[in-house]
């Protein structure tokens, strides 16, 4: 399966791949200069002692509060060439509702089991039908959202490093977003159906939150980082009252 594509005048292929596979790879959204600039912006932002920073033995491997410490990160969705495609998928008036940052520092790699992204960040917990499992992460209330909402959302993973087998790529099950009522399929997933996402710095992996995915360990001895900006997008006026997004940057 070829999930790599880029088009500036027509997004027919991207729409087809998103519908069929739940994902596609958008090549070269950022050039080398832009990648370097965003790495610098991230490094400066992460000098803060914000509660959303995730560290292990002094190495930062993530941030749950990217919109708080680096507000202009929303420009990656708003001002670059991918904006037109997002408008076509989500409709005008959409917003960035959560921003995360992930790294796999050399000698501090990590892995995640197979899962789907089902939680959303809200302003406050509320008793609304089908919104469950209230939690608080980095001081931000979260809920598990119903399938109907997650099906309308979109995730951008902007890669600031080249990713290959050496530095712990994402692995996905193409098409799994279409059978996401529960996660029973993850225990019996065929290895032949699993696709590792290898990409260049500046590429963007576009996916539906309900696409099943895992994250592999980096290889021992690697000197490579795997720095990724993760932005979650949602249409306007989609949350039922009284729920509100913790952030909605349009």
Which residues does each predicted region cover?
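Non-heme Fe(II)/2-oxoglutarate
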Residues: 48, 170-172, 177-195, 201-206, ...
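Short, solvent-exposed loop/turn segments at secondary-structure junctions
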Residues: 30-32, 101-104, 119, 162-165, ...
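A structural signal for short, well-ordered beta-strand segments and their strand-loop junctions
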Residues: 25-28, 95-98, 155, 169-172, ...
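Non-heme Fe(II)-dependent double-stranded beta-helix
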Residues: 1-21, 27-136
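Catalytic palm active-site di-aspartate
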Residues: 22-23, 202
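Catalytic core of non-heme Fe(II) oxygenases with the double-stranded beta-helix
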Residues: 108-198, 240-246
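A structural signal for short, well-ordered beta-strand segments
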Residues: 98-100, 156-158, 229-233
């Amino acid at each position: 399966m070829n999930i790599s594509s880029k088009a500036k005048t027509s997004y027919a292929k991207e729409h087809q791949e998103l519908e069929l596979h739940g994902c596609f790879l958008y090549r070269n959204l950022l050039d080398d200069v832009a990648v370097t600039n965003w790495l610098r912006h991230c490094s400066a932002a992460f000098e803060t002692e914000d509660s959303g920073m995730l560290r292990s033995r002094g190495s930062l491997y993530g941030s749950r509060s990217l919109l708080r410490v680096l507000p202009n990160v929303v420009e990656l969705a708003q001002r670059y060439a991918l904006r037109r495609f997002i408008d076509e998928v989500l409709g005008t008036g959409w917003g960035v509702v959560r921003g995360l940052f992930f790294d796999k520092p050399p000698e501090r790699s990590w892995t995640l089991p197979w899962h789907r992204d089902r939680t959303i960040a809200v302003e406050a917990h509320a008793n609304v039908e089908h919104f469950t499992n209230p939690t608080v992460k980095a001081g931000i209330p979260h809920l598990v959202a119903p399938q109907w909402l997650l099906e309308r959302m979109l995730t951008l993973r902007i890669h600031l490093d080249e990713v290959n087998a050496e530095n712990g790529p994402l692995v996905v099950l193409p098409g799994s977003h279409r059978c996401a009522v529960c996660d029973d399929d993850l225990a019996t997933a065929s290895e032949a159906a699993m696709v590792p996402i290898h990409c260049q710095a500046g590429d963007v992996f576009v996916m539906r939150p309900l696409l099943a995915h895992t994250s592999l360990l980096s290889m021992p001895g690697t000197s490579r980082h795997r720095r990724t900006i993760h932005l979650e997008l949602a249409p306007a006026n989609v949350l039922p009252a009284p729920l509100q997004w913790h952030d909605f940057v349009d």
